[in-house]
């Protein structure tokens, strides 16, 4: 689904299928052809991995969790253990993966979670790294509107009315 217009994709495949691809935990969308310009192996930022890592041509949230969780454990958690504050900026799907991992959110619950774009999410963790408190920063009405906007991204125009 990378690089595709969400509304046009919903018109082509149907809202239910696009929602399944975008929000389910373990259903991958169709893979990109290897010669597709959107293939990460053809993108400049990923050239440093050429020959060392096979970059995926499709990914579901389960795959993202499998990448995010070890990164959190090896790179982020040690900094927090040293008392550092850590700022993470990421795509919504990576944030969903991190939330699932940190908050132990069920597969079904994560399917309905919409991450608002550009809204800071703050975690307060206990010493054992369980979540003490998590919440978005900002005006609740604006945050709700941003969550709703993300939810509506793959809904066809005529169904919004």
Model-derived segments and spans:
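Short catalytic/ligand-binding loop motif for oxyanion handling, primarily in non-cytosolic enzymes
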Residues: 29-31, 95-98
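Short, well-ordered beta-to-alpha junction loops that form the rim of enzyme active sites
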Residues: 23-24, 83-85, 89-93
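Short alpha-helical linear motifs
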Residues: 46-47, 88, 160-161
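Short glycine/proline- and acidic residue-enriched helix-loop micro-motifs
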Residues: 4-8, 17-63
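Acidic, low-complexity terminal tails and accessory targeting/binding regions
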Residues: 1-13, 36, 57-66, 70, ...
């Amino acid at each position: 689904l990378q690089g595709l217009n969400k509304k046009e994709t919903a018109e082509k495949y149907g809202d239910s299928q696009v929602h399944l691809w975008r929000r389910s935990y373990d259903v991958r969308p169709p893979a990109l052809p290897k010669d597709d310009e959107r293939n990460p192996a053809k993108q400049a930022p990923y050239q440093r991995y050429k020959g060392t890592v096979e970059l995926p041509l499709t990914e579901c949230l389960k795959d993202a969790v499998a990448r995010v969780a070890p990164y959190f454990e090896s790179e982020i958690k040690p900094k927090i253990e040293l008392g550092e504050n850590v700022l993470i900026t990421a795509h919504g799907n990576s944030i969903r993966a991190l939330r699932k991992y940190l908050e132990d959110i069920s597969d079904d619950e994560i399917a309905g979670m919409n991450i608002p774009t550009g809204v800071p999410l703050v975690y307060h963790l206990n010493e054992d790294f369980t979540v003490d408190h998590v919440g978005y920063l900002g005006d609740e009405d604006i945050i709700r509107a941003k969550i709703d906007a993300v939810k509506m991204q793959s809904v066809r125009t005529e169904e919004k009315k």
